[in-house]
């Protein structure tokens, strides 16, 4: 099977947005206009083409990034649909990792919202070029220029319109193209009948003004264009397009488009934007990796003749074919039925079948090429973030970093039959989602599941019921507290047992000190002259790491500390790894009295949108939840309150906000950072955990 589309004509893009900005509808329309769907499904009716898990259809939100392939003007566009709800940021992270470009969808009434900030930040981390689509121009309160202003004010993005809307709200009837300097008028409901027209008289001055602003902004990033502009020469549309493309691909500039996906306006022009301005796999730097045995850094060029290298970015259990592993090919080609090496796990895998995914049907293909995104059936050991590569040319591509869970609940099966199935279900769900964890509490014997938020865990429990037929009772949510040290101290840990038979002897002196918040645990070996032999040093580190899982105050994990092993002693016969492990854990326990341990709690960044009349009540409520109001602003006829609130105080907030605002308020929250728990509250938590 020969390559159908050249690498230059391939686009791997994601569509990212805040919940409800209309992302799924935009994706649907893209699939409709590229001829992949014959009838359009609406998200509010629960029939959307991309949202194919049952819960997604019920809740009208996108949970799993389905990868779909579409074609437009001789180009292949692979689309990864990403969720907009904060509890699913891991899905966004993992899809951004394998994208070359993205469309950020904004709601024309709200502009940039909290989750937009989160996904924008993630995309910046991965260096993903973006174009912006201001959607819902037909909605009451739609304001294109306000939305562009929020890109500058909240994201500090160098974003400029390449289009202007003709009219807004129910008067929205067309789009002005500032590059071509023409306009498009829509004649029918499905948006297929478009007429290219002159720019209407009353919009001409505005179009000239914004075209000049666009040229100025792009010329600042392009010397040749700047010279022409300063000398007053005419800049052709081809030159302008090329300069916008270059600046967009280097992530210095973000073109802004407008439209209404729901009303079928602006989607084809947005597709032109994807082809014109977003990069192909050859436009971006080749991916870097390391050779497993030598740790040498190598690059893998986007080239069919290079050795095969791919990254698995999603694992799913499919009711018909079993385990599906979605992967992005960075270099080389792969035939179905062949063997590859999972270099991350050092396991050989056989690629059974290769499927190209459409939103809800799949096409079996015999070969994939550099730049392709596909799904493999039959991989046994591969999980999210693993590298698959040619057996003779091993490489490990940079893997993904996932945030730690912030919320836990206890879960117990309703019957004995459920018990056995629950273990399997939890294992499969953990394979699919690295931010979901399940473990057994050693003291109570309960199964504890942890995730990124209440909705995340709701959906996990829901999936256990639907997909794995496991009925379970769920306890009240628990906050993932942490512990850390405030002071430095030198502490001794000694473990000596000499009573009959072989003795045990381990003795260490460790200096503990606070580390920067978020830096984690750092261990330093400062032993001089072999007072603790080299072979026992790893045991000291392992002993500390194990003991840190159960902190000294209330049994929560200890984070953000440094430990320097600087002295100790050993016994020729009685010393062992185990003895030094125990000595290190005793040192950590002894640090409790000297290092001033404190509890830390997750602080959430909360944004509440409410009608003005409820402002006083909501501000009071936030303060009563130990929240700090960070700022407020008017958005249309609503007020937006931004605050930092401890997660412990946010349980059940959705219900309380509904009753305080008669259902007219909405809120979003994202984990922001950990900070110290006030002493009076910490004392209560410690008491409760010690069962006093």
Curated annotation (Swiss-Prot):
InterPro entries: EFG_II, EFG_III, EFG_III/V, EFG_IV, EFG_V, EFG_V-like, EFTu-like_2, G_TR_CS. GO terms for molecular function: GTP binding; GTPase activity; translation elongation factor activity. GTP binds at residues 17-24, 81-85, 135-138. One of its GO terms (cellular component) is cytoplasm. It is found in: Cytoplasm. Residues 8-282 form the tr-type G domain. Its main location: cytoplasm. The keyword tRNA processing does not apply. Keywords: Cytoplasm, Elongation factor, GTP-binding, Nucleotide-binding, Protein biosynthesis. GO terms for biological process: ribosome disassembly. Belongs to the TRAFAC class translation factor GTPase superfamily. Classic translation factor GTPase family. EF-G/EF-2 subfamily. Catalyzes the GTP-dependent ribosomal translocation step during translation elongation. During this step, the ribosome changes from the pre-translocational (PRE) to the post-translocational (POST) state as the newly formed A-site-bound peptidyl-tRNA and P-site-bound deacylated tRNA move to the P and E sites, respectively. Catalyzes the coordinated movement of the two tRNA molecules, the mRNA and conformational changes in the ribosome. This is Elongation factor G.
């Amino acid at each position: 099977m020969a390559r159908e589309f050249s690498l230059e004509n391939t686009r791997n893009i994601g569509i990212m947005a805040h919940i409800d900005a209309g992302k799924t509808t935009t994706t649907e329309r893209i699939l409709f206009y590229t001829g992949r769907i014959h009838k359009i499904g609406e998200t509010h009716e629960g029939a959307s083409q991309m949202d194919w898990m049952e819960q997604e259809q019920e809740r009208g939100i996108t949970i799993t990034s389905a990868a779909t392939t579409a074609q437009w003007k001789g180009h292949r566009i692979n689309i990864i649909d990403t969720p907009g709800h904060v509890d699913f940021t891991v899905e966004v992270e993992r899809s951004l990792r394998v994208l070359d470009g993205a469309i950020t969808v904004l709601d024309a009434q709200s502009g940039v919202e909290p989750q937009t900030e989160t996904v924008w930040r993630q995309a910046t981390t991965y260096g993903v070029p973006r174009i912006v689509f201001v959607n819902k121009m037909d909605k009451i309160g739609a304001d294109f220029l306000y939305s562009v202003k929020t890109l500058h004010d909240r994201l500090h993005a160098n974003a400029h319109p390449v289009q202007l809307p003709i009219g807004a709200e129910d008067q929205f009837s067309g789009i002005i193209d500032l590059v071509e300097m023409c306009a498009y008028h829509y004649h029918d409901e499905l948006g297929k009948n478009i007429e290219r027209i002159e720019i209407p008289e009353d919009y001409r001055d505005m179009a000239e003004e914004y075209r000049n602003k666009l040229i100025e902004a792009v010329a600042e990033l392009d010397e040749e264009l700047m010279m022409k502009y300063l000398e007053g020469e005419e800049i052709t549309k081809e030159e302008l397009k090329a300069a916008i493309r270059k600046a967009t691909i280097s992530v210095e500039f973000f073109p802004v488009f407008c439209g209404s996906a729901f009303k079928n306006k602006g989607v084809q022009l947005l597709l032109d934007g994807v082809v014109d301005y977003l990069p192909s796999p050859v436009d971006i730097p080749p991916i870097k990796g390391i050779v497993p045995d030598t740790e040498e850094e190598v690059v893998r060029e986007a080239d069919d003749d290079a050795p095969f290298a791919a990254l698995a970015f999603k694992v799913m259990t499919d009711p018909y074919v079993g385990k599906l592993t979605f992967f992005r090919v960075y270099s080389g080609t792969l035939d179905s039925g062949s063997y590859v090496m999972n270099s991350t796990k050092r396991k050989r895998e056989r690629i059974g079948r290769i499927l190209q995914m459409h939103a809800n049907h799949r096409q079996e293909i015999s070969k994939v090429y550099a730049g392709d995104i596909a799904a493999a059936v039959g991989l046994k050991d591969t999980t999210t973030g693993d590298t698959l590569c040619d057996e003779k040319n091993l490489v490990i591509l940079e893997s993904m970093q996932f945030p730690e869970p912030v919320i836990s609940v206890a879960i117990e099966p309703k019957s004995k039959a459920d018990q056995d199935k629950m273990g399997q279900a939890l294992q499969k769900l953990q394979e699919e989602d690295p931010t979901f964890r399940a473990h057994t509490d050693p003291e109570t014997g309960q199964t504890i599941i942890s995730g990124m938020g209440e909705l995340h865990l709701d959906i996990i429990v829901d999936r256990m019921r639907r997909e794995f037929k496991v009925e379970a009772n769920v306890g009240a949510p628990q906050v993932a507290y942490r512990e850390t040290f405030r002071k430095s101290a030198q502490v001794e840990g000694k473990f000596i047992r000499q009573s009959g038979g072989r003795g045990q002897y381990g003795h260490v002196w460790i200096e503990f000190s606070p580390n920067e918040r978020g830096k984690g645990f750092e261990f330093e070996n400062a032993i001089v002259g072999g007072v603790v032999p080299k072979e026992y040093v790893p045991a000291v580190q392992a002993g500390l790491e194990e003991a840190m899982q159960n902190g000294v105050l209330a049994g929560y994990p200890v984070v953000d500390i440094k430990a320097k092993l600087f002295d100790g002693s050993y016994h020729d016969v009685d010393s062992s790894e185990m003895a030094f492990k125990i000595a290190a854990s005793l040192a950590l326990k002894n640090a409790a009295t000297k290092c001033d341990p404190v509890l830390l709690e997750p602080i959430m960044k909360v944004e509440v949108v409410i009608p003005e009349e409820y402002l006083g009540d909501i501000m009071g409520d936030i303060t009563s939840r130990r929240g700090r109001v960070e700022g407020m602003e008017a958005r249309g006829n609503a007020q937006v309150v931004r605050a930092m609130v401890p997660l412990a105080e946010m349980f059940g907030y959705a219900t309380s906000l509904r009753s305080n605002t008669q259902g007219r308020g909405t809120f979003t929250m994202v984990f922001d950072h950990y900070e110290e728990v006030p002493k009076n509250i910490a004392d209560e938590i410690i008491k409760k955990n010690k069962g006093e």
